[in-house]
Amino acid sequence: MRNEMHLQFSALSQNESFARVTVAAFVAQLDPTLDELTEIKTVVSEAVTNAIIHGYENDPSGVVYISVIIEGHTVHLTIRDHGKGIENVEEARQPLFTTKPELERSGMGFTIMENFMDEVNIYSKVNEGTTVELIKHLTKSKALCN
């Protein structure tokens, strides 16, 4: 069985915690380990923060889109924006790369996503936006959505 959720919200930094908690509540039906749930919450925070700060440059008129699909023991997350896009995705994936060096703890978002998820795909076009697809295979899951 498959279960899915879709969410959209204004590109405001205070909505990052809302997105993180909402996704965690949805994924909790699979009874993930605490580590798995923490990793999912962390990558949602990183991807949403990237969309708000880098994609929309803190323009609250932007909209961030999240979809979560559960299939068996696997969680598929997609975070999308219609912001300014990424010129060079491979460069952006390098640890410590940032276009905003003035920001604290910049340059680790994609590295964190790659360390916590089983698969990370990033699609981006300049002036059209970015889509981040994240896949996590849960290890100790009762998988209520079989």
From Swiss-Prot:
Single Gene Ontology BP annotation: sporulation resulting in formation of a cellular spore
Matches recorded under Pfam families: HATPase_c_2 (PF13581)
Domain of life, source organism: Bacteria
MF terms (GO), sorted A to Z: ATP binding; protein serine kinase activity; protein serine/threonine kinase activity; sigma factor antagonist activity
EC number per UniProt: 2.7.11.1
InterPro entries according to UniProt: Anti-sigma-factor_SerPK, Anti-sigma_F, HATPase_C_sf
Catalytic activity, as annotated: L-seryl-[protein] + ATP = O-phospho-L-seryl-[protein] + ADP + H(+); L-threonyl-[protein] + ATP = O-phospho-L-threonyl-[protein] + ADP + H(+)
UniProt keyword list: ATP-binding, Kinase, Nucleotide-binding, Serine/threonine-protein kinase, Sporulation, Transferase
Family, as annotated: Belongs to the anti-sigma-factor family.
Role, per record: Binds to sigma F and blocks its ability to form an RNA polymerase holoenzyme (E-sigma F). Phosphorylates SpoIIAA on a serine residue. This phosphorylation may enable SpoIIAA to act as an anti-anti-sigma factor that counteracts SpoIIAB and thus releases sigma F from inhibition.
Protein name (Swiss-Prot/TrEMBL): Anti-sigma F factor
Originating organism: Anoxybacillus flavithermus (strain DSM 21510 / WK1)
Gene: spoIIAB
